[in-house]
Amino acid sequence: MIDKNFWQGKRVFVTGHTGFKGSWLSLWLTEMGAIVKGYALDAPTVPSLFEIVRLNDLMESHIGDIRDFEKLRNSIAEFKPEIVFHMAAQPLVRLSYEQPIETYSTNVMGTVHLLETVKQVGNIKAVVNITSDKCYDNREWVWGYRENEPMGGYDPYSNSKGCAELVASAFRNSFFNPANYEQHGVGLASVRAGNVIGGGDWAKDRLIPDILRSFENNQQVIIRNPYSIRPWQHVLEPLSGYIVVAQRLYTEGAKFSEGWNFGPRDEDAKTVEFIVDKMVTLWGDDASWLLDGENHPHEAHYLKLDCSKANMQLGWHPRWGLTETLGRIVKWHKAWIRGEDMLICSKREISDYMSATTR
């Protein structure tokens, strides 16, 4: 699993470090002693986890657009990283209907820019390309998708992630082929996670942030698709998988340069209705929800991942169940409302996760 000693002094470059997942990953890496530089647009929300935990004081932060190839290349070349996590993205399904050009240019060409930079700069040993479970051609199957299933995507966001996977595959085959690993020395993996939730997410049109905003303002939560099933998991679950993949790529790049799924156990793939009912109970104070009867852009109703490969080959397993995850989210958010030091609270969350046993 995660080897904290491995990360001591490692030079790590994170794109998208100002986002929800990127902030949690950057904080975790700095906690383990890594020297971290981030490259991203300004924090996408106000408030943001990046600002609240004062990440600017813990790492080098370069504000820039992943679509600006020269700026990205110069930033990476100056830093000379050993490991790269590529998270920069337009991450919202509904926004992708409104901004398809920006979604594709960021998620597809951004990936091209990152991988071309890795090819040109050299001396980078491990690249973890973060996409999404929505990269798969979703047929609303009752079983989970495996890493060798076809890429697809109904909406611009999901399809852009499928395209990003194809980009990574092409670069791996053409420039970072495991068969020629001794020549190039680069391990390149793509990682795919389900619906990631946790404290510190204020994004628009995401279920948990929408619920918390409504509760905080004493308003009913408006729910679009109560019967949609998603593979819900605490943000630290897939991040732990990404970290393990990076470790393996660094030491055995040829063996682990492929796609990896990171999702919850089957019993934690629950309906939206289940989530909101649990959150109502955990929050208390007369919290409630209401069904939105309006028509909305298409979103998948059923999507699960098969994580057998990560379980068997990486020794990765989920540690927190859905009920504990939701409880931790409410606890984290109420601590923020009370004005507690969220850097301390977030470090404690990481420590709790690291010490938890697999379920």
UniProtKB/Swiss-Prot annotation:
Protein name, per record: CDP-glucose 4,6-dehydratase
CDD domains with a match to the protein in the record: CDP_GD_SDR_e
Class of this enzyme: lyase
GO BP, sorted A to Z: O antigen biosynthetic process
Transmembrane spans: none
Pathway(s) per entry: Nucleotide-sugar biosynthesis; CDP-3,6-dideoxy-D-mannose biosynthesis; CDP-3,6-dideoxy-D-mannose from CTP and alpha-D-glucose 1-phosphate: step 2/5; Bacterial outer membrane biogenesis; LPS O-antigen biosynthesis
Family in the record: Belongs to the NAD(P)-dependent epimerase/dehydratase family.
Species assigned in the record: Salmonella typhimurium (strain LT2 / SGSC1412 / ATCC 700720)
Keyword Membrane attached: no
